[in-house]
């Protein structure tokens, strides 16, 4: 089942996550939460913020999720395609959970949270980048960019955690491509935003669009893998 699920998750990546940064620091934060009260009902919440300004919000059931860009980062036609892709991803994501539940009895409610982003420190210091995944309110795994490795965020040793780390650390996409997304794409975008904060025009618009698409593809590819591994194990110790 896992070998079937992982490629689907890796290829179905349309979603984004984020957290509000109200103090206006030079950073990009992304947060996404999926709340399953049972196998058939899910409520999504998410947002993206850049330098303390919300850029996107997402909320609602998978059958009628409201997705809004709060700043005109994409032209209407382009944004409509993004919305459609994201809606498709959410429906597929819910379908995967139901499929796994049919084969393995999962404990509900189930809440999955991913939080990632980059923060630019004072000049001369290294940027702080991160990706954290929590399940049912408890820290699960997180990414360490220094060695491009995932590590456990729980003191409880279990087969589920061990298996998850083995899988996440086995793929270039979930290691080196993720590090590149966080340390390069994310950081460079924030830097460009700072230098062109008061500039309006096509160059800025293209940068925004590129970053938005990067967030949609990059963040949920990794989150989907982590979530899929957890669901495939049924949330139980192996």
From Swiss-Prot:
UniProt PTM: N-glycosylated. A soluble form exists; probably released by a metalloprotease. Seems to have the same activity as the membrane-bound form.
Disulfide bonds: 118-186
Signal peptide feature range: 1-17
GO cellular component assignments: cell surface; centrosome; extracellular exosome; extracellular region; extracellular space; focal adhesion; perinuclear region of cytoplasm; plasma membrane
Bilayer disposition of the protein: Single-pass type I membrane protein
Keyword Ribonucleoprotein: no
Cytoplasmic-side positions: 232-238
Gene Ontology terms: biological process: blood coagulation; negative regulation of coagulation
All ranges on the Extracellular side of the membrane: 18-210
GO MF term set: signaling receptor activity
Keywords: Blood coagulation, Disulfide bond, Glycoprotein, Hemostasis, Membrane, Receptor, Signal, Transmembrane, Transmembrane helix
tRNA-binding among keywords: no
Subcellular location, principal: membrane
Membrane-spanning ranges: 211-231
Glycosylated residues, chain numbering: 47, 64, 136, 172
Subcellular location: Membrane
Tissue specificity remark: Expressed strongly in the endothelial cells of arteries and veins in heart and lung, less intensely in capillaries in the lung and skin, and not at all in the endothelium of small vessels of the liver and kidney.
Task of the protein: Binds activated protein C. Enhances protein C activation by the thrombin-thrombomodulin complex; plays a role in the protein C pathway controlling blood coagulation.
Name the UniProt record assigns to this protein: Endothelial protein C receptor
Organism: Homo sapiens
């Amino acid at each position: 089942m896992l070998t079937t699920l992982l490629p689907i998750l890796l290829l179905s990546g349309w979603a984004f996550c984020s957290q509000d940064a109200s103090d206006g620091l030079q950073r990009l934060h992304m947060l996404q939460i999926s709340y399953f009260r049972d196998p058939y009902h899910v409520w999504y919440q998410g947002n993206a913020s850049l330098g303390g300004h919300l850029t996107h919000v997402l909320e609602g059931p998978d059958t009628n999720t409201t997705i809004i860009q709060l700043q005109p980062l994409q032209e209407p036609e382009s944004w409509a395609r993004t919305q459609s892709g994201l809606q498709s991803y959410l429906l597929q994501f819910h379908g995967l959970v139901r499929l796994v539940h049919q084969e393995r009895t999962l404990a509900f409610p189930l809440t999955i949270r991913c939080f990632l982003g980059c923060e630019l420190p004072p000049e001369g210091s290294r940027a702080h980048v991160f990706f954290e995944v929590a399940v049912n309110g408890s820290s699960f795994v997180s990414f360490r960019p220094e060695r491009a490795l995932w590590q456990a965020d729980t003191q409880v040793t279990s087969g589920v955690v061990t298996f998850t780390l083995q899988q996440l650390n086995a793929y270039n996409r979930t290691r080196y491509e993720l590090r590149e997304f966080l340390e390069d794409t994310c950081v460079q975008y924030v830097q460009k935003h700072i230098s062109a904060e008061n500039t309006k025009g096509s160059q800025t618009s293209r940068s925004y669009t590129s970053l938005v698409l990067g967030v949609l593809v990059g963040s949920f590819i990794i989150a989907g893998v982590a979530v899929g591994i957890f669901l495939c194990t049924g949330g139980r110790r192996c």
